[in-house]
C-alpha cells in the first residue's frame, strides 16, 4: 500500500493527560503534512484544532466518556453534543464495560443510543475495550452497534492493559459485516502491525505513531 493511501486510514492521535497546546499544534501540522484522515484529541483542544485545520481536509475526532466509559449517559450525550458544537466531526465514545460484565445489555444499548442521538448524524465510533471482553461479549457489543447503525466499532482506548489484536479485529469485522467501519487502536506502532489490522478488516487505524507507520519505521516511544 502506498504511504499516502495508508495515511488516509490513520486517526493521528494525542490523548494522554500531559499533552499541551503546543503538542496539539504539532499534531495538526503533522496531520496536514502527511495527509492523515484526522487528528484524535481530547475535547478541550477542539477549538485549537479547528483553528489549525481550517481550510484543510483533515478532520477533527474527539473522545467521549474517555477512557473508562463509566460516566452518566446524560453526561456522555452532553459531552458529544458540546464537542460537535465546538467543531468535532467524528466522535469516539467508550462503551460501559461494567454494564457489559454485569449482563446489563439494555443499559449498554441505551447508553450508545443516547450518544448516537446527540451526534445527530455526526460519525460515531464505539470503543469496546476488547482486552477486557470475552469473544462472546465482543460479538454481542458489535451486534448492538450494528443494529443501532453507528459508524464504527473500535477496539481500544489505548489506556488499558492491551490494545488491538488481529483476532479481535477479525471477529469484529465478521460480526458487523460490511455495514460498519472497524477501527483498530492501541499499540499500533509500525507498518507491519497496521497492515495486519487492515488485512484483518480494519478500515481505520488509531495511533500516535502515524508518521512511523506510513514511513515504514518502528516507533518505540510506547505511546497510544
Swiss-Prot record:
GO terms for biological process: 2-deoxyribose 1-phosphate catabolic process; carbohydrate catabolic process; deoxyribonucleotide catabolic process. It is found in: Cytoplasm. GO terms for cellular component: cytoplasm. The keyword Calcium does not apply. The active site is at residues 92, 154, 183. GO terms for molecular function: deoxyribose-phosphate aldolase activity. It comes from the Bacteria. Pfam families: DeoC. SUPFAM superfamilies: Aldolase. Its main location: cytoplasm. The keyword Cytoplasm applies. Keywords: Cytoplasm, Lyase, Schiff base. It is an enzyme of class 4 (lyase). InterPro entries: Aldolase_TIM (IPR013785), DeoC (IPR011343), DeoC/FbaB/LacD_aldolase (IPR002915), DeoC_typeI (IPR028581). Catalyzes a reversible aldol reaction between acetaldehyde and D-glyceraldehyde 3-phosphate to generate 2-deoxy-D-ribose 5-phosphate. HAMAP family: DeoC_type1 (MF_00114). Belongs to the DeoC/FbaB aldolase family. DeoC type 1 subfamily. This is Deoxyribose-phosphate aldolase. The lineage of its organism: Bacteria, Pseudomonadati, Pseudomonadota, Gammaproteobacteria, Pasteurellales.
